[in-house]
Structure formats: structure tokens, C-alpha cells
């Protein structure tokens, strides 16, 4: 166990530290998604690893003699959870969970959605807007760029009420509009 008040790592580091192809892929993802460091990427990979492990466990339980009713219940719990976060479609199966990619997980981060919805010009600017408190979900300020946005919350992303960016004539808003992002 351990001391419950002490935080523990939420990710696992790669086993081969200097594998060239992995390093190149990580660098590309960090640049594309505007991640601060590799730790953020490793966290996303660890979350996906847990989902895949749950799906593999379901497959093993199914072949091990679990009743159809229990299997369907557990499968629906897993798929509904992933559907709520927008990682799989509504009619997904265990195979879809096993086929998840880290890019799908990174696409659900608040930082990425702020950029894609046109609130910022670049991933770095999206991160800055979030950490400085200019972005809100359902009217509540969110200052965590790695916040996983649920499917229902996606339409509720906006500028935070007291933020100067809510004003349409703000210079940065006009730059964003001129850039053709929004």
C-alpha cells in the first residue's frame, strides 16, 4: 500500500528509453498537441492501457465461462464510459476498445478542443488561455489543459465570463478571426 495522502505516479515510463521510432513518434505528438512534456503523453498512454486491459479481461472472462448477461453488463459499462468521453461510437464493441489509439485520447483534452473549436490560434496559445483562466465549461472556469472533456460538455466550451477575451473587439479575438481559425 502506501501512505494515502501521498500522490503516486499516474503513468509508466517506457521500458526502452532510447528507441528511435518511439522518440520520433513522441516528439511529433508533443508538437502536434502542444504538450508540455512527455509525462503528459505517458499519462494518456497509461489511461488507454487501463481501458485495453479492461477489454482484454472481458474477452478472457467471456471465454472463461462468464454468463452472457454478466458479460453484456460489464461490456456495456466499459463502452458507455468510453462513449461518454467520446473515445468510441455508440455501437462500439470490445474490439473497438482494443483498437483505441493515443491520438484519440489526446483529441479529448481541453487544450486540443479549444484549438479545434477556434478559441486559439495554436496549441501553445490554447494552453495559455486555459492556464490563465480564460476558458470555461458550462460557465465554470477550467485551468487544467489536460482536462478530459466529456461528449456532453464539448458544446459548452466558451470564454470565461469575466475574461477580457469575451469582448468581441479584443485584439486577440480579431487576430484569431483573421487567422481563419474561427
Swiss-Prot record:
It comes from Methanoculleus marisnigri (strain ATCC 35101 / DSM 1498 / JR1). SUPFAM superfamilies: Alpha-L RNA-binding motif (SSF55174). Belongs to the universal ribosomal protein uS4 family. InterPro entries: Ribosomal_uS4, Ribosomal_uS4_arc, Ribosomal_uS4_CS, Ribosomal_uS4_euk/arc, Ribosomal_uS4_N, S4_RNA-bd, S4_RNA-bd_sf. GO terms for cellular component: small ribosomal subunit. GO terms for biological process: ribosomal small subunit biogenesis; translation. CDD domains: S4. Keywords: Ribonucleoprotein, Ribosomal protein, RNA-binding, rRNA-binding. The keyword RNA-binding applies. Residues 108-172 form the S4 RNA-binding domain. One of the primary rRNA binding proteins, it binds directly to 16S rRNA where it nucleates assembly of the body of the 30S subunit. One of its GO terms (molecular function) is structural constituent of ribosome. PANTHER family: 30S 40S RIBOSOMAL PROTEIN (PTHR11831), 40S RIBOSOMAL PROTEIN S9 (PTHR11831:SF5). This is Small ribosomal subunit protein uS4. Part of the 30S ribosomal subunit. Contacts protein S5. The interaction surface between S4 and S5 is involved in control of translational fidelity.
Amino acid at each position: 500500500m502506501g501512505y494515502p495522502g501521498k500522490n503516486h505516479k499516474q503513468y509508466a515510463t517506457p521500458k526502452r528509453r532510447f528507441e528511435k521510432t518511439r522518440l520520433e513518434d513522441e516528439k511529433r505528438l508533443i508538437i502536434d498537441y502542444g504538450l508540455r512534456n512527455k509525462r503528459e503523453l505517458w499519462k494518456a498512454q497509461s489511461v488507454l492501457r487501463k481501458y485495453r486491459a479492461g477489454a482484454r479481461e472481458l474477452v478472457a472472462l467471456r471465454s472463461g465461462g462468464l454468463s452472457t448477461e454478466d458479460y453484456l453488463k460489464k461490456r456495456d459499462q466499459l463502452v458507455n464510459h468510453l462513449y461518454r468521453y467520446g473515445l468510441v461510437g455508440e455501437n462500439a464493441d470490445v474490439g473497438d476498445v482494443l483498437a483505441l489509439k493515443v491520438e484519440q485520447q489526446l483529441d479529448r483534452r481541453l487544450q486540443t478542443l479549444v484549438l479545434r473549436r477556434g478559441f486559439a490560434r495554436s496549441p501553445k496559445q490554447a494552453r495559455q488561455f486555459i492556464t490563465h483562466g480564460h476558458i470555461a465549461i458550462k460557465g465554470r472556469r477550467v485551468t487544467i489543459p489536460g482536462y478530459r472533456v466529456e461528449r456532453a460538455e464539448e458544446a459548452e466550451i466558451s470564454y470565461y465570463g469575466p475574461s477580457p477575451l469575451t469582448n468581441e473587439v479584443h485584439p486577440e479575438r480579431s487576430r484569431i478571426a483573421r487567422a481563419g481559425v474561427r
